Amino acid sequence: MTLPALKPTQVLVKTHQASVCGSERYFYRGINVRPQDEARGGSEVQLGEAPADSHAHAYPMGPLGHEGGGEIVEMGSGVEEYLGGGAVRIGDRVGSLIYPTFTDYWVTDIRHIQPIPAGVSYEVGCLYEPLGCAAWAALHAGYKLGDVVAVNGVGFAGNILLQGAIKSGASKVIAIDMVQAKLDVAKALGADYVINASEVDPVAAVEEITKGEGVDVAVEAVGGAGAGLVQALDMVAHNGTLALYGDNYAPIKEFCFHRFHEDGLDVRNLNAVHYTPLRSIEHMREAYRVVERGVFDLDIIFKHSVTYRLDELPTVFQNETAHLEQQGSLKTIILP
């Protein structure tokens, strides 16, 4: 194998562990995710279809994989410190914030990786981007002591957000998902109520639990076609908080913003990394201080994850995109 020559600010990383992001499953299917794509393709374009001009927002958008970590084995001549501070050394264990991690070795700019904190295991540190994003979201979702919280979507990130609500002193925490296995994890983590949205209307169930008042904080961690976002809006109480984590890929054509105005809702963007590079790094370091202190139960996350080898990746995507809404495991881990 011939490894590429490094530019001055680049490093070569040997992969220890990567993982699959939920968004990549949609991209793999060629799902049309941006309003501008739909406009370009015309009124006939629907979620899950490529525009007529063949410019689908499809997978891969770039080099394969953006979750993972490994060991720095070579450095460019201009590499001195990480963005945000800290000397860079050969042998450092690092987590990735961007492509390309679905490979044995990868080259990236030093701005796009961060050292795994000393108090965090290698395996947990290789979840740097997804875990950091979820932990930061849990810190900024707006939970207060005594709140009633609903987490709509309890996959990997949703179950981190759910733990954040419990640790923050919520009086009731409601977990919602279409997959019973994920709800079982949420229950084991301490959810007071679990609602299987494939069996009952989750909005009606929340209304019954809250005696018609709604929840103080509605967390949207489903993403996808936007149904979870509409449900979260229908669950939140007057003057409540709508905390948006999931990436909703399709335009929501019938969506009334009047409730935001009339009910004085607090709307929070819980995406940690779509900011300036330095601010994104600050968010991740803030999140990992909490991870390093053992606030979250991560053992149960790994217990309910699945592991594959890198050469099995094509089969992984074929299998996991067959039923996008029924993914049973919390995280799919890829080993070189």
What feature does the model see in each segment?
Residues 92-93, 105, 136, 148, ...:
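Residue-level marker of beta-strand positions
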Residues 101-104, 178-185, 251-257:
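Short, glycine/polar-rich helix-capping loops at beta-to-alpha or helix-loop-helix junctions
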Residues 98-110:
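A structural motif shared across PLP-dependent enzymes of the aminotransferase-like
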Residues 4-19, 31-98:
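Glycine-rich beta-strand-centered segment in the early N-terminal region that forms part
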Residues 201, 230-234, 238, 277, ...:
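C-terminal hydrophobic helical "lid"/dimerization subdomain
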Residues 141-144, 189-267:
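Glycine-rich cofactor phosphate-binding loops and adjacent beta1-alpha1 units
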Residues 121-200, 204:
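Mid-domain Rossmann-like dinucleotide-binding core that forms the NAD(H)/NADP(H) cofactor-binding site
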Residues 94, 149, 214, 218:
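Receiver (REC) domain switch-region micro-motif
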